[in-house]
Amino acid sequence: MRWTGPGSGARLEEDPTDDERSTMTDATNAGAAGTITIGELTVNRLGFGSMRLTGKGVWGPPDDHDESIRVLRRAVELGVNFIDTADSYGPYLAEDLIREALHPYRDDVVIATKAGLLRTGPDVWIPLGNPSYLRQEVEMSLRRLGVDRIDLHQLHRIDPNFPLEDQVGELATLQQEGKIRHIGLSEVDVDQLKAAQKVASIVSVQNLYNLTTRTAEALLDEAETQGIAFIPWFPLAAGPLADADGPLGSLAADHGASPSQLALAWLLKRSPVIVPIPGTSRVDHLEPNVAAAGIELTEEEFQAIDAATAGK
């Protein structure tokens, strides 16, 4: 079984237009988005995803190593204190970059990583939930990140070849051993979340969710009901909707912002448990992403965006 990631027709987080980069790039602090408590860890609701820091196909080193380091350091300067990564990004290289850029970590910085996807080449992702493999990857992430305990460890994918209870159960055992503080899940449905919660306390879920892909609505509603974090990956994939002459263009202009920034503002307004993690490999893309934390949509604007983009 292979997962090939987002479709090639969608816009990646690091592809804003020149016009987008010229709008609303003031150094807004990520704290403008408000905060959320994940377990007992309080973080700003605008995080950073490290997948785009690596090479093409999320494979190999970045094209510009020094710029990747600058991106991470600038993110923290701008108040981003929730950094999402995974053993499979690179593989391993994103975790290495995070340690190089940010270690020793500030007390308020939360590093969330994942395991459960095996990499054999660019754009190839193979679920592997063998409990012994998950344990091995947790141990290696501890070394790469330079920590004694991982703040949030997420099961990257549920492997159908192993019982869910065994996969989550191994993370629970590692938690009891003090190697993991909190456990999260990625790409699950409501039933899988509830099944996992019979084995361990789950504090977050991470699914594909954005203006144009809302198949995880039921999971988001469940996360909000339970008060656990919902981390949408690929949050800026809005395709043609992000074009200046698309449905978001006029409203974006009213805010002095870009359509992509409005897409982030919509997510932040959608639910108080949402923690977007837009990623990029360039500082000049990072800053407008963080600036979106300062955009406050009215309920009327939120509903207008919702109506214009639903089902697109």
What does each of the following model-derived ranges do?
Residues 142-160:
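Active-site groove signature of glycoside hydrolases
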Residues 26, 30, 158-312:
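Beta/alpha (TIM)-barrel catalytic core signal, keyed to glycine-rich beta->alpha loops juxtaposed to Asp/Glu
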Residues 40, 77, 99-110, 142-146, ...:
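Acidic (Asp/Glu)-rich catalytic clusters
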Residues 2-109, 238:
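N-terminal binding-site loop/beta-alpha segment at the start of enzyme catalytic domains
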Residues 60-67, 93, 97, 125-136, ...:
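Alpha-helix N-cap and loop-to-helix initiation/capping positions
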Residues 39-59, 112-125, 149, 154, ...:
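N-terminal small/glycine-rich loop or linker at the start of catalytic domains
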Residues 61-75, 129-145, 189-195:
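Short, acidic/polar
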Residues 48, 85, 113, 152-155, ...:
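Conserved beta-strand positions
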